Amino acid sequence: MGTLNRTVAIVKSRSGAQIRLTERQWKHIITARPQLEDFQDEILKTIEDPDEVYAPPPRVRPQLHALKKFRLLRNVGLNENLVVVYREISPREGFIITAFPISDIRRRRIHRLWRRL
């Protein structure tokens, strides 16, 4: 297995699937958003303990969007809502696709499946 396919971390999603973060996807995330480089733990925590989980519009590939609020993101000039996009390829496993901060307004564009009360 190549270095880029090496698993960096594995976390459990709300549904119980083991979601992996590979070196390739981690490089993708920090290349697109270098300010997230110090927030790997928060990205993983978003999958493990989300505030909300969304599904994309029907025409988009099957993936989930976990959202969690981290006020400390504001300390580096980012929106405090962190979204982690991931895919569950079976009931037991999946992988992280990407992660990004968003505003409250933008997150309403996708369909909420679950919300912490």
PLM features: residue spans?
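Ribonuclease/tRNase effector modules and their secretory precursors
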Residues: 1-117
